[in-house]
UniProtKB/Swiss-Prot annotation:
One protein family per Pfam: HSP70
Disulphide connectivity of cysteines: none
UniProt induction comment: By heat shock.
The name this protein goes by in its record: Heat shock 70 kDa protein 1
CDD domains, sorted: ASKHA_NBD_HSP70_HSPA1 (cd10233)
MF (Gene Ontology): ATP binding; ATP-dependent protein folding chaperone
Keywords of the record: Acetylation, ATP-binding, Chaperone, Cytoplasm, Cytoskeleton, Methylation, Nucleotide-binding, Nucleus, Phosphoprotein, Stress response
Organism: Chlorocebus aethiops (Green monkey)
Gene: HSPA1
Entry-linked InterPro entries: ATPase_NBD, Heat_shock_70_CS, HSP70_C_sf, HSP70_peptide-bd_sf, Hsp_70_fam
Region spans: Nucleotide-binding domain (NBD): 2-384
Length: 638
């Protein structure tokens, strides 16, 4: 068997995507619904857990227990202003557990609380299963992408989510790495400056790369860490006000109504990318009132005009950081679903004086595409398409330590190419100081109190000579963007170090181990549920097929009334039993099926012995393919 491939996963805020590099090219893998992107949604019901399309399809029926946007929680504190702001829009409950946010849901009749890492791990597990179903063998190695502006704890938390999902995370890479996809499709030689404009479901960043003969150097990244795709929110608020004007009723506190409205708004927003007008038709939205309305593209652009304009600020910042003029940018690449909005494209085009935008990459798939290529490189793929590619990524934030007066002294500057290592000599501040406290920060502000504390450690046993000791401090970032800090007293050789992997926001080894075991348990429960539903569907399908077989007009005179009655009575008995026992176990359904077969098989096989008919049990008995098989497969939202 060929060596198992590593996969590239774009773990998105609203949608996720998985790709694999094989036979010299990237394949984006479709899920069991035939979709190449999968909603980053997890739903909990009284009977099961649903992930992806199945979870999103039932969101209007079960808004409190359907979790999305976990990426906006991951690696953040509960008190973070972004978390507090987002909580106002979410129908599910977020609780505080020692300043770590947890999502509280009702699952199988019990109240459960999950860390964002656990929710993200469930989405990653789904992406892993999608890849395995396509490739036909177990997959463990993966590259996972994060936004360029993600800080250390957000990167670590994403890596933890991968571990909980049973993945060996080869590397956490910045999403702009996806331009590898772009470069693979380019045959032109010579140095080119490329600006990637990435506007997704909950993240927004801009990167500038220089590509020269297979070497990618990230010159600058800029992003809006507080960005949330407010386009949907603006539409929702607009229609809530319209409903209030028309019907004198406020629907904003009704979670189901708001969820149905949001789904319709999301659809309208997509329609407005290709049409100048979109209609919304939602039956019985609130208190039996049907809501039929429409919106023009011009009105949508007016509602979001400030948001559209604000997307140019990170573009200007990235150009300043890269020390480039906009005329020096050769290519503009659009990534992320929201770049399909015509107004966004026009603003960007006007800013770059009418320059053509590169739309050759599918914006939804570009990230997974780039991640799949990176996974192949890390696994030692020797295809000529990838062997000459080298990606030089950058540190998204400055890293340094606190010096007297609370001053931030940066050793690694923002946008430094990684991996990197920087060393600087410090001395003791006061006479006869026996030890130094090394406090490590990330951020761009002059004072450490305004930056993010990553960790601290002490170097003790320093000889008590005033201002003489020489302390050598080394900051080293590896290719995953993970930081090691070492301090050495040059006179004694004493050293101490810290790996910034376990700041207060991070899960402990024990917690991760527990979550891995729980993930296995949930997966096993999901499998039991799938088998149960499959057995139920098989029984129902068999009973209905037997019923229609003996009622077939073509069999008149071939089957005695007594036999016909026997089959119909037994089928009806089974159908009634099914209606009353929808939550029965797999073996109960199988037992009922055997009972039914014992009655039907002798009669049916007698009928078909002469001709090649369906034969005993030959009708259906398969149940629906794919999916989790239970609950509503579609839910009408409009």
């Amino acid at each position: 068997m060929a060596k198992a491939a590593a996969i590239g996963i774009d773990l998105g805020t609203t949608y996720s995507c998985v790709g694999v590099f094989q036979h010299g090219k990237v394949e984006i893998i479709a899920n069991d619904q035939g979709n190449r992107t999968t909603p980053s949604y997890v739903a909990f019901t009284d009977t099961e857990r649903l992930i992806g399309d199945a979870a999103k399809n039932q969101v209007a029926l079960n808004p409190q227990n359907t979790v999305f946007d976990a990426k906006r929680l991951i690696g953040r504190k509960f008190g973070d202003p972004v978390v507090q702001s987002d909580m106002k829009h979410w129908p599910f409950q977020v609780i505080n557990d020692g300043d770590k946010p947890k999502v509280q849901v009702s699952y199988k009749g019990e109240t459960k609380a999950f860390y964002p890492e656990e929710i993200s791990s469930m989405v990653l597990t789904k992406m892993k299963e999608i890849a395995e179903a396509d490739l036909g063998y177990p997959v463990t190695n993966a590259v996972i992408t994060v936004p360029a502006y993600f800080n250390d704890s957000q990167r670590q938390a994403t890596k933890d989510a991968g571990v909980i999902a049973g993945l060996n995370v080869l590397r956490i890479i910045n999403e702009p790495t996806r331009t590898i996809a772009y470069a693979l499709d380019r045959t032109g030689k010579g140095e080119r400056n490329v600006l990637i404009f990435d506007l997704g479901g909950g993240t927004f960043d801009v990167s500038i790369l220089t590509i020269d003969d297979g070497i990618f150097e990230v010159k600058a990244t800029a992003g809006d860490t507080t960005w949330v795709e407010d386009f949907d929110n603006r539409l929702v608020n607009h229609f809530v006000e319209e409903f209030k004007r028309k019907h004198k009723k406020d629907i904003s506190q009704n979670k189901r109504a708001v969820r149905r409205l949001r789904t319709a708004c999301e659809r309208a927003k997509r329609t407005l990318s290709s049409s100048t007008q979109a209609s919304l038709e939602i039956d019985s939205l609130f208190e039996g009132i049907d809501f039929y309305t429409s919106i023009t593209r011009a009105r949508f652009e007016e509602l979001c005009s400030d948001l559209f304009r604000s997307t140019l600020e990170p573009v200007e910042k990235a150009l300043r950081d890269a020390k480039l003029d906009k005329a020096q940018i050769h290519d503009l690449v659009l990534v992320g679903g929201s770049t399909r909005i015509p107004k966004v494209q026009k603003l960007l085009q006007d800013f770059f004086n009418g320059r053509d935008l590169n739309k050759s990459i599918n914006p939804d798939e570009a990230v997974a595409y780039g991640a799949a290529v990176q996974a192949a490189i890390l696994m030692g793929d020797k295809s000529e398409n990838v062997q000459d590619l080298l990606l030089l990524d950058v540190a998204p934030l400055s890293l340094g330590l606190e010096t007297p007066g609370g001053v931030m002294t940066a050793l690694i500057k923002r946008n430094s190419t990684i991996p990197t290592k920087q060393t600087q000599i410090f001395t003791t501040y006061s006479d006869n100081q026996p030890g130094v406290l090394i406090q490590v920060y990330e951020g761009e502000r002059a004072m450490t109190k305004d930056n993010n504390l990553l960790g601290r450690f002490e170097l003790s046993g320093i000889p008590p000579a005033p201002g003489v000791p020489q302390i050598e401090v080394t900051f080293e970032i590896d290719a995953n963007g993970i930081l090691n800090v070492t301090a050495t007293d040059k006179s004694t050789g004493k050293a101490n170090k810290i790996t910034i992997t376990n700041d207060k926001g991070r899960l402990s080894k024990e917690e991760i181990e527990r979550m891995v075991q729980e993930a296995e348990k949930y997966k096993a429960e999901d499998e039991v549920q799938r088998e149960r539903v499959s057995a139920k569907n098989a029984l129902e399908s068999y009973a209905l097929n037997m019923k229609s077989a003996v009622e077939d007009e073509g069999l008149k005179g071939k089957i005695s009334e007594a036999d016909k009655k026997k089959v119909l009575d037994k089928c009806q008995e089974v159908i009634s039993w099914l209606d009353a026992n929808t939550l029965a176990e797999k073996d109960e359904f199988e037992h009922k099926r055997k009972e039914l077969e014992q009655v039907c098989n002798p009669i049916i096989s007698g009928l078909y012995q002469g001709g090649g008919g369906p034969g005993p049990g030959g009708f259906g008995a398969q149940g629906p393919k794919g999916g989790s098989g239970s609950g509503p497969t579609i839910e009408e939202v409009d």
